[in-house]
């Protein structure tokens, strides 16, 4: 669990840094930097974090990593990232206000709580879904082949 905490929180710190820097440099929340750019950056960060977590698990296991162990490590990392990133965005919306959500499609037509709930569910479920995909692929390549 220590590995998942370490790498999941590192991914979240990268996301926090991206959000803070990009909102300072590009204040318009409708800019493509906040949509497409953030999506690409966050997914690459998530992929790298999952890879490093699974690779660390393999090193700690003296090079003997099973597919199941790699998958569990990657999913635990994705869960830590999903929870901590959701908490960060909750604090950000409560402190900055709903203008942080201005770039979300349809957010201007919904009450703030509904737009925020949709964003949190998307972030949480999306992080777990992509974490499953990334962990599966990474574990497939890093796991020790089973002998018959």
Where do the model's predicted regions map?
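Short, charged juxtamembrane terminal tails flanking transmembrane helices
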Residues: 1-3, 139-148
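Transmembrane alpha-helical insertion/packing segments
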Residues: 1-57
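Membrane-water interface at transmembrane helix exits
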Residues: 22-26, 54-58, 88-93, 134, ...
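Hydrophobic cores of alpha-helical transmembrane segments in multi-pass inner/ER membrane proteins
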Residues: 45-50, 127-137
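Hydrophobic alpha-helical membrane-insertion segments
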Residues: 74-92
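Functional transmembrane-helix hotspots
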Residues: 87-109
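Hydrophobic alpha-helical transmembrane segments
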Residues: 111-134
């Amino acid at each position: 669990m220590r590995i998942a905490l370490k790498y999941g929180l590192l991914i979240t710190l990268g996301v926090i840094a991206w959000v803070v820097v990009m909102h300072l440099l590009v204040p318009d929340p409708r800019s493509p930097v906040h949509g497409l750019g953030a999506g690409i950056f966050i997914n690459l960060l998530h992929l790298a974090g999952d890879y490093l977590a699974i690779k660390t698990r393999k090193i700690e296991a003296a090079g003997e990593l099973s597919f199941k162990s790699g998958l569990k490590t990657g999913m635990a990392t994705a869960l830590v990232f999903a929870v901590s990133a959701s908490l960060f965005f909750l604090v950000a919306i409560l402190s900055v206000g709903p203008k942080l959500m201005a770039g979300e499609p349809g957010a201007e037509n919904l009450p703030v709580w509904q737009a925020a709930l949709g964003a949190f569910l998307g972030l949480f479920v999306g992080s777990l879904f992509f974490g499953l995909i990334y962990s599966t692929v990474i574990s497939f390549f890093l796991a020790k082949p089973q002998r018959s």
